[in-house]
Structure formats: structure tokens, C-alpha cells
């Protein structure tokens, strides 16, 4: 059967007509014909390579017998939970679904609007053949297109895939946690993530981050199974790893660092345990499948992908978004906003994380590497490439962070519970973790509402200003001019702004993402912050730094 699959994939690669397929894609794509033809050739080669890999992996896989594991320890002693534990975890996932469906139709933010305009309402042909912006999370764009096509162009339809992927990541965390800790700790970690305002927010964001989180957890679970195994199990685990890892990469390209981290850990384990030679091949085939599936998924858009991602974000512009210190501050501020007690609670959480890291390090250093190394590689490479370093790039590690936090609570209770309290340590740890979950749930109201309130800003200006007196800048252009269809003027440079001002008694300027505007249009930013302009109204949403600012200039007679 495996050979038949391999031959079928190779046959598809051989018969696919390059020129005709490229022309068909070009009829709807944002890319030029030459780029698409190159992509079709890559797709043919990737398909042939994938088919050959299927055949080779089946031919050279271990056929039987037992061998040493690359990593000792296996599953947690409590890895086979009772039906009650599974039922409780399922109930938590249902609660998580309800929390993520509430207020799902609230206002979109810029990246979501960009996804809706470019991919949500476009043809599927355009979606699978275009990669003209770094904002394209390819797998999510496809899911969003299917959802919007079936349910209509609404905010909730655009976000529905993120909700589903977010809820699936809760169940995935539960199953992963059973491999490394007790059912009680696994359940509490799942509950904490279910009521986390950050996880709810990402699950209501039409981007690929919850899909990447799901893939990260599933791929890590399969990786553990691979390095733990002591007997041949066929291609089930290698193919499962390849599918999970490539799905994450298809969601967001930075997931490649997850695979790179696993590969580095595998090399280290092979070096430490030379006696486990029999367990090297299955893990090798897992990485081969991850590479082949990822290349196959990106093949058609790969020429565009390389061109789009090879350059730095906002080239030639100085911005705090590339500063690691800014990223640390922003991450801290975002986490503090989602915790009762703010920064004090965050500092206390840091102590618990340190204890949790120590505990997992004592349990297995390889586990610690699985938890931490992907995030370290992501930060290192993104900074080296000159790209903006967003805290959301590390959301794929949220499940691991929660596990570390819950372990830290157990260790902290163990350190503090002395004397007559020793016998109550487990109950006290449960109580402390439950209180943490309740406290986290108390911050959920801050999560709901428009991520950016473009609708309110548009209505405000419609009531107070004539259309010919209103102009937009940079990241305000798409939401107002394209998505809302406002008949306002687009300003591209300082000269355009000054010409727009000329002859008008009153000028209204609407902008968003002030940090971005200050970086890409410093001259305009300087003029808008001069004494000639004042802030008329600021519209805040739940997205940090995404405020919409309406500025007004009243002519003093100098322009007539």
C-alpha cells in the first residue's frame, strides 16, 4: 500500500502540465506568470521527491526487534488516565469553546482585515497561488477562505478556524501533558490555558497562531514517542510527525524552528546514546517527511515566498519593534495585563517559572530543551534577519509555558508546606492552581471587544466631517478606504499632506499604529505632532498599540 501511494504521487508529478497549470493560476494570482511556472516546476519536483520518500522510508524502515531508546523514561506513570479524567478534560474543552465563541463578531484589526480582503473573499485559486505579503499565513488563509465562502464575509466566519484550532490545542495539551506529568497537573494546565485571556484572544484572531500552537504540541508529543520507542512501529509515527510539523510550518514559517530544535535535540541524543542505533532511523524519516510535506505545501508559492521573506521588515527604517528589549517589555506588559495583580503577579509568576524549569530539568534535560529551544532559535534567527520581533511569534510555546508554571506551583507548595502541612501538599497545590485559574478567568472581560475599533472611528468622522476633508495614512488606508469603502483621500508623503491641507478650513487625518507611522513616515509624523494639529479623538481596542487616532487641523489663514 505504501509503495502504491508513492507511485501515485510520482505519477501526478509526471503528468502535471507546467505551462497550462501556470497560466490557469496566473488568471487569478497576484504573482507573475514566470514565478508561477517556476512554482509549478518546484511542485512537480517536490511531489516526485515525496513519492520517492514514501517508497524509500518503507523499504529501509526497521522491520522488527527491540532496541535501546534514545531517551529513557517513557511515559509518566499516570499516562493512561481514567474515563473521569478524560471527561473532565473534555468538559474543559467545551468551556473553552464557549469562551472563544462569545463576542466573536467584534471589530477586526488590521491583519485580519488584510486577510479578509486578500484571501477571505478571493477565489481559492488566488489563495493557493499568491504570497505577496508576510501577512499571509497560508494554511490559515485557505481555512478562512473556506469558512467565509460557506458562512459569508463576517468577522466570526473569518475567525472560526482560529477558534477550532484553539480548542483542539487544549485537547492536544492535555494529551501531551500526560506524557510528562500527572493527570492532575495535566488537567490544571489545560484548565489554565482554557481560561487564559491570551489564549482566548489568539483564538479570536484570524491568524495562524493557534494552528501553530496545535502543531507545536502535537509534533512535540510525537517526537517524544519517537525517541522513547524501543521497537519498530512502521511509518505511523514518522508520517504523523511530518504531517504535524509541516502543518505548523504551513500555518507560519517560523514553525521551522520547532523542527530545527527537535533535530538538534535528536543529534544530541544520538551522541549521548550511541547504543540506540536502532532508534535513529524512525526519527530521521520523521524529519524527512516534515521537510518533504513542507516543501510540497509551499511549492507553488515558493519563489514568491523567498522573495517576500528574504528582505527585512520596513527596510531602512528605525523602529523599536526590532529591539529585543522592546519585545521583552511588550511581552511583560501584555502578560501583566492578562493577570490579576499586574506586574506584581508577573514577577511572582517568574519565580514559579524558575521553579518549574528547575523541576523539569531534574526530570529530563531533553524535556527542558523541547520546551525552550524552539523559542530561542526563533528569537535568534528573526533578529539576525532584521525582521520585527513580535511577542506573538512565541505563542506556539504557550502550552509548554503553562506546564512549567503549574509545575512551579507544585514545587513552591512543596517548599513552603512544612511540618503538619506536609501531608496536605497535593491538596494545597491543587487549591493554589485552581485559584490561579479563577484569577486568570477574572481577566477575560478585558479580552472581549473590538481588536481595533475602525467602525466607531468611521462613524465618528462621518458625523463630524465632510468626506473631502478627511484623509488616511499608511495602515489606516486598507481598513477605511478598501474594507469600509469610505470616499476619503489617501496620503502617501509629506508633500501630499501639505497639498491636501491647502485651501481647506478644516483637515481631518485618521491614522492607526502610531509606532509604525513614526517609523515609515517620520516627516509626516513630525508635522502631525506639531502645534498645528491636535488629537480630536482616540479609539482604543483590545490590540495593544493599535489605537486609532483622529487628528484635526483648523486653518489659520496661512494656506489661502
Language model regions located:
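Serine-esterase "nucleophile elbow" of acetyl-processing enzymes
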Residues: 86
Amino acid at each position: 500500500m505504501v509503495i502504491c501511494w508513492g507511485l501515485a504521487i510520482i505519477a501526478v508529478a509526471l503528468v502535471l502540465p507546467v505551462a497550462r497549470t501556470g497560466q490557469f493560476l496566473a488568471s487569478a494570482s497576484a504573482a507573475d506568470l514566470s514565478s508561477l511556472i517556476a512554482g509549478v516546476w518546484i511542485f512537480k519536483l517536490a511531489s516526485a521527491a515525496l513519492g520517492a520518500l514514501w517508497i524509500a522510508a518503507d523499504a529501509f524502515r526497521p522491520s522488527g526487534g527491540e532496541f535501546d531508546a534514545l531517551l529513557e523514561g517513557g511515559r509518566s506513570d499516570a499516562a493512561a488516565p481514567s474515563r473521569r479524567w478524560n471527561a473532565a478534560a473534555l468538559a474543559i474543552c467545551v468551556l473553552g469553546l464557549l469562551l472563544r465563541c462569545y463576542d466573536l463578531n467584534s471589530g477586526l484589526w488590521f491583519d485580519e482585515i488584510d486577510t479578509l480582503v486578500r484571501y477571505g473573499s478571493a477565489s481559492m485559486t488566488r489563495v493557493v497561488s499568491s504570497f505577496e505579503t508576510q501577512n499571509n499565513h497560508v494554511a490559515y488563509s485557505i481555512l478562512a477562505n473556506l469558512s467565509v465562502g460557506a458562512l459569508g464575509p463576517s468577522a466570526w466566519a473569518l475567525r472560526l478556524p482560529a477558534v477550532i484550532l484553539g480548542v483542539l490545542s487544549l485537547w492536544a495539551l492535555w494529551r501531551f501533558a500526560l506524557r510528562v506529568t500527572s493527570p492532575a497537573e495535566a488537567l490544571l494546565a489545560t484548565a489554565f490555558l482554557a481560561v487564559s485571556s491570551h489564549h482566548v484572544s489568539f483564538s479570536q484572531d484570524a491568524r495562524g497562531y493557534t494552528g501553530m500552537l496545535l502543531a507545536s504540541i502535537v509534533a512535540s508529543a510525537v517526537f517524544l514517542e519517537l525517541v522513547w520507542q524501543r521497537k519498530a512501529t512502521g511509518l505511523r509515527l514518522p508520517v504523523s510527525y511530518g504531517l504535524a510539523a509541516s502543518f505548523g510550518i504551513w500555518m507560519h514559517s517560523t514553525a521551522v524552528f520547532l523542527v530545527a530544535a527537535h533535530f538538534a535535540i535528536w543529534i544530541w541524543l544520538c551522541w549521548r546514546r550511541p547504543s540506540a542505533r536502532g532508534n535513529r532511523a524512525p526519527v530521521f524519516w520523521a524529519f524527512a517527511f516534515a521537510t518533504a510535506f513542507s516543501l510540497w505545501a509551499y511549492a507553488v508559492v515558493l519563489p514568491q515566498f523567498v522573495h517576500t521573506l528574504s528582505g527585512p521588515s520596513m527596510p531602512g527604517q528605525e523602529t523599536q519593534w526590532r529591539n529585543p528589549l522592546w519585545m521583552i517589555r511588550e511581552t511583560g506588559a501584555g502578560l501583566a495585563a492578562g493577570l490579576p495583580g499586574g506586574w506584581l503577579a508577573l514577577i511572582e509568576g517568574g519565580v514559579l517559572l524558575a521553579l518549574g524549569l528547575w523541576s523539569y530539568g531534574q526530570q529530563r534535560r531533553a524535556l527542558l530543551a523541547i520546551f525552550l529551544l524552539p523559542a530561542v532559535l526563533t528569537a535568534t534567527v528573526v533578529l539576525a534577519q532584521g525582521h520585527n520581533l513580535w511577542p506573538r511569534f512565541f505563542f506556539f510555546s504557550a502550552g509548554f509555558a503553562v506546564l512549567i508554571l503549574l509545575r512551579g506551583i507544585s514545587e513552591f507548595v512543596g517548599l513552603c508546606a512544612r511540618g503538619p502541612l506536609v501531608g496536605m501538599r497535593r491538596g494545597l497545590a491543587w487549591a493554589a492552581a485552581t485559584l490561579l485559574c479563577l484569577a486568570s478567568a477574572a481577566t477575560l472581560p478585558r479580552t472581549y471587544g473590538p481588536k481595533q475599533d475602525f467602525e466607531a472611528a468611521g462613524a465618528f468622522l462621518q458625523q463630524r466631517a465632510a468626506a473631502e476633508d478627511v484623509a488616511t495614512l499608511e495602515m489606516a488606508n486598507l481598513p477605511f478606504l478598501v474594507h469600509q469603502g469610505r470616499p476619503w483621500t489617501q496620503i502617501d508623503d509629506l508633500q501630499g499632506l501639505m497639498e491636501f491641507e491647502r485651501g481647506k478650513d478644516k483637515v481631518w487625518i485618521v491614522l492607526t499604529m502610531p509606532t509604525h507611522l513614526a517609523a515609515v513616515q517620520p516627516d509626516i509624523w513630525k508635522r502631525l505632532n506639531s502645534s498645528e494639529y491636535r488629537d480630536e479623538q482616540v479609539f482604543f481596542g483590545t490590540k495593544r498599540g493599535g489605537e486609532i487616532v483622529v487628528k484635526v487641523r483648523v486653518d489659520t489663514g496661512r494656506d489661502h
